[in-house]
C-alpha cells in the first residue's frame, strides 16, 4: 500500500512539474494564476481519497488553453503579414499597369523597341505634355489651303499679298533651307546665293543674338535629350511623323537688319583718302526686315537633307522657322508740302471758375517764361489780348454750362517779356459728383506756329477773320461809338487793366443762375447746368415793379443778372447767349466806370441798395427805389 502511494505521488509530482517549454507557453497567462498553480503543485494537501487527479487535470486544461492562445496569436500575425504583402502587390501591379498604359499613349515611348523604366516613361510623358501646351485648337496644314489651289499657286498668292519673300531657316545652325525668288526684289540676292548659307552671315552684328533667341526657344517639339535612368545613355526615338500642328507658342514675329546687295559705286582714289575709300567700299547697307511666321518640325528624311552624318543628330526632328520677310521702311512718309510733323508744344493749366490759375504745368516755363508761382492766383484774362477777350469770355461761359470740351480759336497770350504768343486751348470743366458744382476748369494750351496763322486755309477757318475786339462786341448792341480807353502806366499794350474782373463776374452770373434755377419749383429734377425752361406765371409787386421769386425786384437792367431777358410774365430766363454778347450789359465800360467812380457817396448808396435788396428778399420791406443810385438805369 505504501509502495502504491509512493508511485502515485511520483506520478503526480512528475505530472505537476512543468517542462521548460511549458513554462514559456504558460507565461502568457496572468501572474496570479501562475502563483496559484505553483502553490497548488507544491502543496501536499491534496485530497487523494476518491479524487486523486482532479487538480492536475485543471492545470493541464489551463496549459492547453495558453498554447491555443499563443497559436492563434501567431496565426493572426502571419495572416496580417500576408494581407499587407497582398495589398502591396496589388498596388504595384496597378501602378505598373498605369505606367504601361501611359507609355502606350506617349508617342516617344510607344516607338521604342525595348521596354523603358518607369522614370523614363514619366519623363517622356511630362515632355509630351509640355509639347501639347497651348495647342488646344490644333489645325493641320490641309485646313489652311483651299482645295482648288495648288501649293505653288498658294505660295505666289501669299507672296504677292505680303509683298515680301518666303524663307525657311533651320533652328539649330541658322542655315537657310529655302528662300523664294522674290527675295531678289528686296535684298538684291538671287535664290541660289542664299540657299545653303547661314542666315547669321547676312544679319547685322547687333541683331544676331536676338534672332538666335527667336530660333532657339521652340515650343513645337521637345529639344532636350532623354536619358535612360538605368543605363544613363541618351534615348533614341523613332517617331512616325504625323500631321504638323500650329500652336500659339510657336508663333514668331521680330525685326532684324539684313544685308542688301546694292550695286556699289566705284570710288576713285584721288577723290578720297585710301583708308576712307576702303571703308566705304567694304561697307554694306542694311535694310530692316519684319519677319512673321511659325516654328515647325520635319523629319530629316522629309526635308531631303543629309543629316545622318552630323554627330549631334540623335534622331530628333528638324525644327525650322517658316516665315515671310517684308521690307520695313526706315523713314515715315512726309506730307506733300514737305512740312515735318513734330509733337506739338503744349502745357496744361487748371483754373478756378473765375479764371484764376490754380495749377500750371512745368512746361509752361519754357513756353511763357513765367515761373508757375508767378501765374498762380492771377486771372488768365490779364494775359489775353484785348481783341480776343470777347471770344474767350464766350468760351468761358460755355465751358461752365456744359460738360463738353470747348476748343477756342487761336488767340494771343502775353508772355513775360511783354510780347504775345499764339495759342489754341481745349477747355473742359470738372464737376464734383457729390455737390454737382463745377470745381475747376482744365485747359490744354497748344502753341500755334506762325506758318499756320499765315496760311488761314480751310483747316482753320476761324483764322481767316480776326476775332472781334471786346469793345466792338459790347458796343454792337447799344449802337454807340467805340470808346477809347486810356493807357495805364506800367501795363503793356494789348492787354486791358482790370480784365481779371471779367472772369469773376462770369462766375457770379452762372452761380446766380444756378441759384435761381435751384429755387424754382419746376427745376427740381433738372441739372444745375441746364438753365433753360418754361417761365412760371406772372408775379408783380404792388408798386408796379417786377418782382423775382416772391420779393426780389428785377435788377437785370442794372447788370447784376446779365445774360437774362424778361418775357411778358416778368420772370427772367437765359436766352443761351454770351454774357458778353449783344444783349449783355457787363463789359469793359462798366469796369472802367467802376474804377473811375470810387467815392464814399457811391459806396454808401451801393450799400443801401444791397441792404434794401436783402430786406426785400427776406420779405421785410416793400419795393426798392433805385432813384438814389448814382448811375443811370
Swiss-Prot record:
There is a cross-link at residue 259 (Glycyl lysine isopeptide (Lys-Gly) (interchain with G-Cter in SUMO2 and SUMO3)). Residues 79-132 form the bHLH domain. Residues 150-222, 333-403 form the PAS domain. A motif (Nuclear export signal 2) lies at residues 368-376. Keywords: Acetylation, Activator, Biological rhythms, Cytoplasm, DNA-binding, Isopeptide bond, Nucleus, Phosphoprotein, Repeat, Transcription, Transcription regulation, Ubl conjugation. Signal peptide: none annotated. Residues 24-33 have a biased composition (Polar residues). It holds the Pfam family PAS. There is a cross-link at residue 266 (Glycyl lysine isopeptide (Lys-Gly) (interchain with G-Cter in SUMO)). GO terms for cellular component: cytoplasm; PML body; transcription regulator complex. The modification Phosphoserine is found at residues 17, 85, 97. It comes from the Eukaryota. GO terms for biological process: positive regulation of DNA-templated transcription; positive regulation of protein acetylation; response to redox state; rhythmic process. Ubiquitinated, leading to its proteasomal degradation. Deubiquitinated by USP9X. Component of the circadian clock oscillator which includes the CRY1/2 proteins, CLOCK or NPAS2, BMAL1 or BMAL2, CSNK1D and/or CSNK1E, TIMELESS and the PER1/2/3 proteins. Forms a heterodimer with CLOCK. The CLOCK-BMAL1 heterodimer is required for E-box-dependent transactivation, for CLOCK nuclear translocation and degradation, and, for phosphorylation of both CLOCK and BMAL1. Interacts with PER1, PER2, CRY1 and CRY2 and this interaction requires a translocation to the nucleus. Interaction of the CLOCK-BMAL1 heterodimer with PER or CRY inhibits transcription activation. This is Basic helix-loop-helix ARNT-like protein 1. It comes from Tyto alba (Barn owl). The gene is BMAL1.
Amino acid at each position: 500500500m505504501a509502495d502504491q502511494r509512493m508511485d502515485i505521488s511520483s506520478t503526480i509530482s512528475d505530472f505537476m512539474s512543468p517542462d521548460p517549454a511549458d513554462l514559456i507557453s504558460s507565461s502568457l497567462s496572468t501572474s496570479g494564476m501562475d502563483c496559484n498553480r505553483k502553490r497548488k503543485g507544491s502543496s501536499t494537501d491534496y485530497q487523494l481519497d476518491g479524487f486523486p487527479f482532479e487538480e492536475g487535470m485543471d492545470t493541464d486544461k489551463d496549459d492547453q488553453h495558453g498554447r491555443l492562445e499563443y497559436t492563434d496569436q501567431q496565426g493572426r500575425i502571419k495572416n496580417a503579414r500576408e494581407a499587407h504583402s497582398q495589398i502591396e502587390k496589388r498596388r504595384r501591379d496597378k501602378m505598373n499597369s498605369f505606367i504601361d498604359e501611359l507609355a502606350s499613349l506617349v508617342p516617344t515611348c510607344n516607338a521604342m523597341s525595348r521596354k523603358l523604366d518607369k522614370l523614363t516613361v514619366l519623363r517622356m510623358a511630362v515632355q509630351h505634355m509640355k509639347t501639347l501646351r497651348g495647342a488646344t485648337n490644333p489645325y493641320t496644314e490641309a485646313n489652311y489651303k483651299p482645295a482648288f489651289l495648288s501649293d505653288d499657286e498658294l505660295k505666289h498668292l501669299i507672296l504677292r499679298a505680303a509683298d515680301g519673300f518666303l524663307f525657311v531657316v533651320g533652328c539649330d545652325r541658322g542655315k537657310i533651307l529655302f528662300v523664294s525668288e522674290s527675295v531678289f526684289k528686296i535684298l538684291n540676292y538671287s535664290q541660289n546665293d542664299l540657299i545653303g548659307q547661314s542666315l547669321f552671315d547676312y544679319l547685322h552684328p547687333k541683331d544676331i543674338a536676338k534672332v538666335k533667341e527667336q530660333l532657339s526657344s521652340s515650343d513645337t517639339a521637345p529639344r532636350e535629350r532623354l536619358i535612360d535612368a538605368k543605363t544613363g545613355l541618351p534615348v533614341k526615338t523613332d517617331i512616325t511623323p504625323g500631321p504638323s500642328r500650329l500652336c500659339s507658342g510657336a508663333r514668331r514675329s521680330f525685326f532684324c537688319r539684313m544685308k542688301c546687295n546694292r550695286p556699289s559705286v566705284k570710288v576713285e582714289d584721288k577723290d578720297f583718302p585710301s583708308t576712307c575709300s576702303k571703308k566705304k567700299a567694304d561697307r554694306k547697307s542694311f535694310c530692316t526686315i519684319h519677319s512673321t511666321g511659325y516654328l515647325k518640325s520635319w523629319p530629316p528624311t522629309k526635308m531631303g537633307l543629309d543629316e545622318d552624318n552630323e554627330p549631334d543628330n540623335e534622331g530628333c526632328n528638324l525644327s525650322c522657322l517658316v516665315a515671310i520677310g517684308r521690307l520695313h521702311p526706315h523713314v515715315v512718309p512726309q506730307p506733300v508740302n514737305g512740312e515735318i510733323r513734330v509733337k506739338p508744344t503744349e502745357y496744361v493749366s487748371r483754373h478756378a471758375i473765375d479764371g484764376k490759375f490754380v495749377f500750371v504745368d512745368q512746361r509752361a516755363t519754357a513756353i511763357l517764361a513765367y515761373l508757375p508761382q508767378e501765374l498762380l492766383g492771377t486771372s488768365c484774362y490779364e494775359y489775353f489780348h484785348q481783341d480776343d477777350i470777347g471770344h474767350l469770355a464766350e468760351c468761358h461761359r460755355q465751358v461752365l454750362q456744359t460738360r463738353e470740351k470747348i476748343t477756342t480759336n487761336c488767340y494771343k497770350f502775353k508772355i513775360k517779356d511783354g510780347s504775345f504768343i499764339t495759342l489754341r486751348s481745349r477747355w473742359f470743366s470738372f464737376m464734383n459728383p457729390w455737390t454737382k458744382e463745377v470745381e475747376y476748369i482744365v485747359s490744354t494750351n497748344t502753341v500755334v506756329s506762325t506758318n499756320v496763322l499765315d496760311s488761314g486755309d480751310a483747316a482753320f477757318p476761324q483764322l481767316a477773320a480776326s476775332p472781334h475786339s471786346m469793345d466792338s462786341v459790347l458796343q454792337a448792341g447799344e449802337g454807340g461809338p467805340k470808346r477809347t480807353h486810356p493807357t495805364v502806366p506800367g501795363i503793356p499794350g494789348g492787354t486791358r487793366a482790370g480784365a481779371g474782373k471779367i472772369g469773376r463776374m462770369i462766375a457770379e452770373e452762372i452761380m446766380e443762375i444756378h441759384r435761381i434755377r435751384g429755387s424754382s419749383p419746376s427745376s427740381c429734377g433738372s441739372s444745375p447746368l441746364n438753365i433753360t425752361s418754361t417761365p412760371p406765371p406772372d408775379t408783380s409787386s404792388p408798386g408796379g415793379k417786377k418782382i423775382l421769386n416772391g420779393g426780389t425786384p428785377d435788377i437785370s437792367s442794372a447788370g447784376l443778372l446779365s445774360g437774362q431777358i424778361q418775357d411778358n410774365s416778368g420772370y427772367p430766363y437765359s436766352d443761351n447767349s454770351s454774357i458778353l454778347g449783344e444783349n449783355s450789359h457787363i463789359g469793359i465800360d462798366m469796369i472802367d466806370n467802376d474804377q473811375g467812380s470810387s467815392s464814399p457817396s457811391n459806396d454808401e448808396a451801393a450799400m443801401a441798395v444791397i441792404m434794401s435788396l436783402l430786406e426785400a428778399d427776406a420779405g421785410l420791406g416793400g419795393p426798392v427805389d433805385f432813384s438814389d443810385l448814382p448811375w443811370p438805369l
